Amino acid sequence: TEDLPVDVRFMLPSCVPATPMDESGANLDYRAIDSFYDYPRVQGLAEMMNSYGVIHNDAEVVSKIVASQAHHKKIDGHAPDLVGNDLNAYIAAGVYSDHECHDLNDAIAKLQRGQFIMIREGTAARNLEALVPLLCDKYVERCMFCTDDKHPNDLLEKGHIDYIVKKAISLGADPIMAVKAAGYTAA
């Protein structure tokens, strides 16, 4: 991607297969992904979906987290509906961000514990309307926009992050806060 006109960065998959019952055609354990951390465009570990494994110290999950941390990389989360001590354990393990916030209380609980929140507005899952109040002085420094599973037709017809900025403003967000979540915080 070095010669592309856009600066593309990557996150390594954390859960392939997604669950032990899935058949993905591959099993990417920590040894399979470890050498990829040396690539400068690799930013960290993507979507740590196995929250149960994080909370209960599953050896493979912990190995992936430790490897990412050893390379000074970020760990993105995927933790819908975690609360209380389970949420504390998940975040304390080093999971840096989450895009699975379905309501304002969930997002604020994660922000108060130090996570960054990716406000998702994709094709299947749309959380912007519920989370637009986060686009304020108190929270915007830890909030950014993401699409997560946006269909190519939606990208062509509506746009990407630019669409989310416009929609956030139409929902009452301060334009400066919307632009900040689109660019500054994400960078």
Residue map of PLM features:
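Active-site-proximal loop/turn and secondary-structure-junction residues that shape catalytic pockets
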Residues: S14-V16, M49-S51, A79-V83, D103, ...
